Amino acid sequence: MHFEEHFVRLEALARKLFLAPLSVTRAELRKRISEQLRSEGFSPNTANAVTVRCYSDGAVEIECLDILYNSFALRALHPQAYLCRLSGSLLTENTSAKEAMLELNRTMGQVADEGVALWADEQGEVLAIDGSPVVAVFEDEIRFSRVGSGVEFDLAYNAVKAMGRNVIKEEICLRDLAKAKELLYIDHRGISAVSKFGESVYMDIIAEKVADNIE
């Protein structure tokens, strides 16, 4: 679950957006999550996804979901991606504005059968895919997006370093994607490998190895 890492990120985001700390302590939030999982009958033998929503008035809402896969597995879904231009970095944070944009993009992608949205800024830097941080695999290096963040993203970065691969955190631009061998995005749902973007077709060989090595 990596509760401590998630709590630190949640606290930092609350201070950034609301200019105030969370209204609950570590111990209180951990207890509330445990009690809600137990009261809703979630089994400790299956993977459970927990969403914590914090509001400007200090309210904290917890939603528990039973999922069928390991959070750090390579997902069976291999979508194609389409380009969506964004201005401003706030939509890459886990906010209600981001969720609204994601819902719109996903609906558009389904209607047009275009897959998931690849967000890029006006300068061509790739910000996210389906709202999640991006990794591009090249012939000689594995590049984690410099604007990417998240507990799972950091775990994947450490896993690649432990594998002895040449890994860097640097800008990923649209012009780089034609040279990439694999194009991935990582979040609590797991590691997702894009199958196609534009004229480029991608593999998932390294993605599977990374998933196997995340602790």
What are these regions (language model features)?
Residues S43-T51, E61:
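Ordered, amphipathic secondary-structure segments that act as subunit-interaction surfaces
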Residues M1-E35, S39, Y55-E215:
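Helix-start/capping segments and mature chain N-termini
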